[in-house]
Amino acid sequence: MYSANRSHRAETRNRSKDELRKVINSLEKVRRWEKKLVLIKDTNIRIYKWVPVSAQNIMAPPKIKEVKEVDEESNQVPSAENSQDSTSVTQPPPQFDINEDSNFSTGDHFDSDSNQTFEPQNYQGGATGSTDFSSMRDAEMTSKQP
């Protein structure tokens, strides 16, 4: 009798797991995905990520804000993309290319932490063969001996 109860419990667990899998799979089939520019927490890094379309975006029509005159000082150009409300998704400033390297700077300032220089480097390195350290080894040996 004890073993019958165990098999009965296992059967109900498996059945509930199967039902849960069916529900999840049916939701995944109808879920819509879109690629959005997402700001990573605690950084200024923005990456494209596939995110599910929220029900609010599907149901609510996009809010169109009144187009104002663009000042010369303004960095943002009013458009349908910039007027949509988004909590975790941000649009990049228009002066930056989306595919640019994050270490690239368009400013005329010099990064003091950078080890790069603007002067040409006259490196005359040759990869003609293996490096010979025998002269350095001989000099070391003679300096160690009194």
Swiss-Prot record:
As annotated in Swiss-Prot or TrEMBL, what is the tissue specificity of this protein?
Answer: Ubiquitous.
Positions with biased composition (Polar residues)? 75-90, 113-134
- Name a single GO biological process: apoptotic process
Q: Where do the record's region annotations for Disordered lie?
A: 59-146
Q: Which GO terms describe its cellular component?
A: nucleus
Name the residue ranges with Basic and acidic residues bias: 135-146
UniProt keyword terms in alphabetical order: Apoptosis, Differentiation, Nucleus, Wnt signaling pathway
Q: Report the gene knockout effect.
A: Animals are sterile producing no oocytes, display a protruding vulva phenotype past the young adult stage of development, and have disrupted or no alae formation. Fewer seam cells in larval stages post the L1 larval stage of development and impaired seam cell differentiation with large and irregularly shaped nuclei in seam cell-derived hyp7 cells. Defective gonadal growth and proliferation whereby gonads are thin and shortened probably due to decreased mitosis, and abnormal germ cell nuclei which are irregularly shaped and enlargened.
InterPro entries reported in the protein's UniProt record: BCL7
Cell compartment(s), UniProt: Nucleus
The family this protein is said to belong to: Belongs to the BCL7 family.
Function noted in UniProt = Required for the terminal differentiation of seam cells, and the differentiation of distal tip cells important for normal somatic gonad and germ cell development. Plays a role in the Wnt signaling pathway, regulating the expression of beta-catenin homologs wrm-1, bar-1 and sys-1, and the localization of wrm-1 and the wnt signaling pathway component pop-1 during asymmetric cell division of seam cells and the Z-cell lineage of the somatic gonad, respectively. May have a pro-apoptotic role, possibly linked to the negative regulation of expression of anti-apoptotic factor ced-9.
Q: What is this protein called?
A: BCL7-like protein
Origin species, per record, is Caenorhabditis elegans
